[in-house]
A protein has these predicted regions:
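Active-site-adjacent helix-turn-beta-strand microarchitecture at beta-sheet edges
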Residues: 40, 48-108
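N-terminal, active-site-proximal structural segment of metallo-dependent hydrolase catalytic domains
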Residues: 1-50, 56-68, 73, 148-152
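Metal-dependent phosphoester-hydrolase catalytic domains
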Residues: 98-101, 112, 153-166, 172-230
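Active-site beta-strand/loop signature of hydrolases that rely on acidic residues for catalysis
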Residues: 20-41, 79, 108, 119, ...
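Beta-strand-turn-beta hairpins that frame and shape the catalytic cleft
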Residues: 83-86, 100-131
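Acidic/histidine-rich helix-loop elements
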Residues: 1-12, 127-143
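Conserved beta strand-loop-helix elements of the APE1-like EEP
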Residues: 35, 67-89, 111, 210-228
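Active-site-proximal beta-strand/loop segments in catalytic clefts of secreted hydrolases
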Residues: 32-35, 54-57, 81-82, 90-92, ...
């Protein structure tokens, strides 16, 4: 894994990533654009972490900008501390729309001091940054428009079941915008019940000088206030 990809990581970079992962002091880490379990294990040692990788079939590789190097796979993954009980894992294939070029999501069910929780890790279609994706005729937004109700259906199911849940990952979309259509869709339960969905990252601003609005988010729902505080 260290020698693969468009720009292979150096040993020093791997050490830096491993150090960063330790400094997070996180129990569960959701990742995107992971090539393999072996690559994941270089940053999250299996002696300390349970590693989970999407079962999405490998997509066709391509040459990276005439460099002579071949791309690696892009799959979602989880690293979970060994003392956390994982009760189940499911590939969320519906997000791929039966298109081999689109990423699957991945769902974990974990045991917490407050009960079971479902965590969905997503990496949605890139290239659609319109607040209202339905008003764009770009291929990216048309694809995103098909993924949006799939994600909303998953959230609505958890809302109906009153199951504590998180949705995390790379949405490739500025959900914190006040007129974002996907945010409004997810916050509106079709049965008329009040939504418990909260975007925990809504107030954050990125440090990139040209792209300050984040596209990576942490959404949560059906959590009691002690869970939010902790």
């Amino acid at each position: 894994p260290i020698t693969d990809g468009c720009r292979p990581r150096t040993k020093a970079e791997i050490r830096a990533l491993r150090s960063y992962a330790q400094d997070l002091e996180a129990d569960i880490v959701a990742l995107q654009e992971v090539g393999s379990i072996a690559a994941l294990g270089q940053v999250f040692p299996p002696s300390d972490w349970q590693l989970f990788l999407s079962q999405r079939p490998d997509s066709e590789t391509y040459e990276c900008r005439e460099s002579g190097r071949q791309s690696t796979q892009q799959k979602v993954a989880f690293a979970v501390q060994n003392d956390i009980e994982v009760l189940g894992e499911t590939d969320f294939t519906a997000l791929g729309l039966d298109n081999p070029g689109l990423r699957h999501g991945m769902e974990l069910t974990v045991s917490t001091p407050l009960g079971e929780m479902d965590i969905l890790n997503v990496h949605m279609k890139s290239g659609c940054f319109e607040d209202d994706f339905s008003r764009s005729d770009s291929e990216a937004c048309q694809t995103f428009a098909r993924q949006a109700p799939v994600l909303d259906d998953w959230i609505e199911a958890k809302e109906r079941e009153k199951t504590p849940y998180l949705v995390v990952g790379d949405f490739n979309h500025r959900l914190s915008s006040p007129y974002n259509k996907l945010s409004m869709l997810m916050a509106d339960n079709s049965n008329g019940a009040k939504s418990n969905l909260v975007n925990a990252t809504a107030s954050l601003i990125g440090c990139h000088p040209y792209y300050p609005a984040p596209i990576d988010h942490i959404l949560m729902g059906q959590l009691q206030s002690p869970a939010l505080i902790s």
